[in-house]
């Protein structure tokens, strides 16, 4: 499958295990604020419903969620001027990196990213230098396993999906960017336990890394970028060899 990489699986695990709780709350609150610009009612705002669902899954208190909605929709009178920004660069071994950020200060965010790249063997590039290597797509994660594969295939025949991956304790369903809402709704209606959903950048070509030291350097850079307060997501075309031993 195009864009498959062990980094994707590592990233999902680390997002749960390693994330600092306060930073996660701040990041998710910002996503809610941006989504709420299109309307404070989740029933008519799919982006807001998605952001709220992610926040609840991460344990964000209801009061924080309500406050973020009020700020973003202007009800609190102090709506933050946040904007989505995309940055691109290279890491060790020629790894392409795409970073999505949500910021109220582009200069600060760019400086933080540039420092993280330079300290970890990479460099921040110009807009467009690696974006062509990625495709923006939909992703729905189900609580399911290999035993459910036959029923899953039957469900996907009725939906706008074009692939899936079996992971430990989960199934990741892929589809076109514009199909996210219909895809997750359809899976719910087919009685699947939907864990999370969202858009992600799928690498169309990958950089294979077989050297443990290079692999560690790549992961160190990706972790450093993902740990920055303004960063929403980090995507890379890193493909780690299955037999690779990483401390």
Swiss-Prot record:
Keywords: Cytoplasm, DNA-binding, Transcription, Transcription regulation. It is found in: Cytoplasm. GO terms for cellular component: cytosol. One of its GO terms (molecular function) is DNA binding. Its main location: cytoplasm. GO terms for biological process: regulation of DNA-templated transcription. The keyword Mitochondrion does not apply. Belongs to the TACO1 family. PANTHER family: TRANSCRIPTIONAL REGULATORY PROTEIN YEBC-RELATED, TRANSLATIONAL ACTIVATOR OF CYTOCHROME C OXIDASE 1. NCBIfam families: PRK00110.1, PRK12378.1, YebC/PmpR family DNA-binding transcriptional regulator. This is Probable transcriptional regulatory protein Syncc9605_2132.
């Amino acid at each position: 499958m195009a864009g498959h990489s062990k980094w994707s699986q590592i990233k999902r695990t680390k997002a749960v295990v390693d994330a600092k709780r306060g930073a996660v709350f701040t990041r998710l609150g910002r996503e809610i604020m941006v989504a709420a610009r299109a309307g404070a009612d989740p029933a008519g705002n799919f982006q807001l419903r998605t952001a709220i669902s992610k926040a609840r899954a991460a344990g964000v208190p209801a009061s924080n969620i309500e406050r973020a909605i009020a700020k973003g929709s202007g009800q609190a009178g102090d709506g933050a001027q946040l904007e989505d920004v995309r940055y691109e660069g290279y890491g060790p071994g020629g790894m392409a990196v795409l970073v999505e950020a949500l910021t109220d200060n582009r200069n600060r965010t760019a400086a933080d990213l540039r420092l993280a790249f330079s300290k970890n063997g990479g460099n921040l590039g110009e807009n467009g230098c690696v974006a062509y290597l990625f495709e923006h797509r939909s992703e729905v994660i189900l609580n399911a396993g290999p035993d459910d594969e036959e029923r899953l295939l039957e469900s996907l025949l009725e939906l706008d999906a074009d692939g899936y991956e079996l992971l430990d304790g989960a199934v990741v369903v892929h589809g076109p960017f514009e199909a996210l809402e219909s895809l997750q709704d359809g899976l719910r209606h087919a009685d699947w336990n939907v864990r999370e959903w969202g858009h992600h950048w799928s690498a169309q070509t990958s950089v294979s890394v077989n050297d443990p030291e290079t692999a560690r350097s790549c992961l160190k850079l990706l972790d450093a970028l993902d740990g920055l307060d303004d960063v929403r997501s980090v995507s890379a075309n890193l493909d780690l060899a299955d037999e690779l031993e990483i401390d």
